[in-house]
Regions:
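Long, compositionally biased intrinsically disordered terminal regions
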Residues: 1-475
Length: 475
């Protein structure tokens, strides 16, 4: 309702004294409270915080400094409300969560500033978590429907363009692959992609392979690529793209599709590894999805003297797969994962870490418009990719939660337990990757890479480590 209309009476006969606006206060705890104002004319409701007007209410032009101050105040309040909602959700205080979500929806929008969009994404996920127990309601409203795979794949490709984290990671992986295998006499370089890599990464690898392998250009030098992916269109399109480039480069090329999701890869047999190949295994944002499934491994002597079954250890499917892959004795394994800790059992801590991580991603997406994509494409990435991940982290528990991101410190322990040792990236690989990051950032320091003491490469946005790239070999 327009502010100039406040206090005006309605025209026409009035049969009962109906107030134009109804107001009631709401206490969200933690010292946070405000007032809901409901209009009986147009049915709208907004939430007013002390000395901060609702985002839905019109504002008068102010000086830039005042506008920035108002935005910062509203941002602080949004974060406080989000945190209060998460605390209430963790305690099962549903009415408090409901009021908090009403407040967030009145203050934030999915097409505003990054913080507003972040609040909208997390409000969606918290609302889904609250109604998850009512499966009938979720199904009737279509809340459990996931984004179709082609749309998710398109959003992932657009994310790689707008936020070059994965392009940087793929380049570092390719340099490491070539360096680890170019001195080998094997006629076949077999690269197994467990999923997640962009076809552009393999185009670059083909070109590097053609220029750096012994007797480059001869057809007896073969690059064999195995890709695990469940989409026919992706597999066929990638095969045609790479076969055409290999023919242009006069490089022998073989393509081996494995039509499976990483969750369905129950053994290493479908990978089709052959003896005599220079084997390289690449996993891009895939292994964390296997941490949800745990099982007890039975000892070699499954029964003790009393006939009771002995449990040797409990491991995840990720650990079991890593152990099987180590048994193949690859020349190199490259692992790219989110440098985040979203696998905690405690909900509130997991939520707070996710809020910080995805806040940085949304800021990065915002900065990429319009240089590397449009606002429409940015919105598609947030809706089809980031929202799905946030929903998984915030709304799901148990085996249903697949986005179990872990920091490199934990992945290093898993790799060590599986039988891998670090294959430290050389300084020239780090330098070349750093140059690419500088170019993709338009000459700024928004994206940079850093090699830690253990040889792992971290990709930063400003001061935040966002993704890690680590290289491994077997003893």
């Amino acid at each position: 309702m327009n502010p100039e209309n406040r206090g005006q009476e309605t025209t026409g006969p009035v049969y009962a004294p109906v107030p134009l606006r109804t107001a009631w206060s709401v206490d969200l705890g933690n010292g946070l409270n405000g007032t809901f104002v409901h209009s009986n004319i147009d049915g709208t409701a907004t939430f007013l915080l002390p000395e901060v007007r609702s985002a839905a209410a019109p504002t008068h032009p102010t000086a830039p400094a005042a506008a920035q101050t108002q935005y910062e105040e509203r941002a602080i309040h949004l974060i406080k409300v989000l945190n209060a909602c998460a605390d209430a959700l963790d305690k099962g205080e549903k009415e408090l969560v409901n009021k908090g979500l009403q407040m967030i929806c009145s203050l934030a929008s999915d097409d505003g500033e990054p913080l507003h969009r972040l609040a909208s994404l997390f409000a969606d996920a918290m609302a889904l978590r609250m109604v998850q127990p009512w499966q009938g309601v979720c199904r009737a409203l279509g809340l459990q429907k996931t984004t179709p795979a082609p749309e998710t794949a398109a959003a992932r490709r657009q994310f790689a363009v707008m936020c070059p984290f994965l392009r940087i990671a793929g380049t570092a992986a390719n340099y490491a692959i070539i360096k680890a295998t170019q001195t080998k006499n094997n006629a076949v370089l077999h690269v197994v992609d467990l999923g997640g890599a962009n076809p552009d990464q393999w185009l670059l690898l083909l070109r590097l392979f053609a220029t750096t392998r012994p007797r480059a250009g001869a057809h007896d030098q073969i690059l064999r690529l195995t890709i695990v992916n469940e989409e026919d269109e992706f597999l066929s399109g990638t095969a045609a793209l790479l076969a055409s480039e290999a023919a242009r480069l006069h490089v022998g090329f073989q393509f081996h599709p494995v039509k499976l999701n990483i969750n369905q890869l129950l053994s290493i047999e479908p990978l089709g590894v052959r003896t005599g190949e220079a084997l390289v295994i690449v996993s891009t944002l895939q292994l964390h999805r296997l941490l949800a499934d745990e099982f007890a491994e039975v000892a070699a002597n499954p029964h003790d003297r009393k006939g009771k079954k002995q449990v040797h250890a409990t491991m995840t499917r990720a650990d079991a797969l890593l152990r099987d892959l180590a048994g193949l004795s690859p020349k190199l394994m490259v692992v790219t994962e989110q440098e985040a800790d979203h696998n905690g059992a405690e909900f509130t801590g997991r939520y707070r870490k996710a809020l910080k991580y995805y806040g940085a991603l949304l800021d990065a997406l915002q900065e990429s418009v319009p240089a590397r994509g449009s606002a429409v494409e940015r919105a598609g990435v947030e809706r089809c990719l980031l929202l799905e991940e946030i929903r998984d982290i915030v709304a799901c528990e148990g085996a249903q939660r697949r986005e179990r991101h872990e920091p490199m410190l934990k992945w290093a322990a898993r790799m060590d337990a599986a039988g891998f040792v670090p294959a430290v990236m050389s300084p020239d690989i780090v330098a070349q990757t750093g140059i690419l990051a500088h170019i993709l950032a338009g000459g700024s320091t928004a994206y940079r890479v850093s090699r830690e003491e253990d040889g792992c490469l971290f990709i930063y946005r400003n001061d935040d480590p966002m993704f890690s790239v680590s290289t491994w070999r077997t003893v």
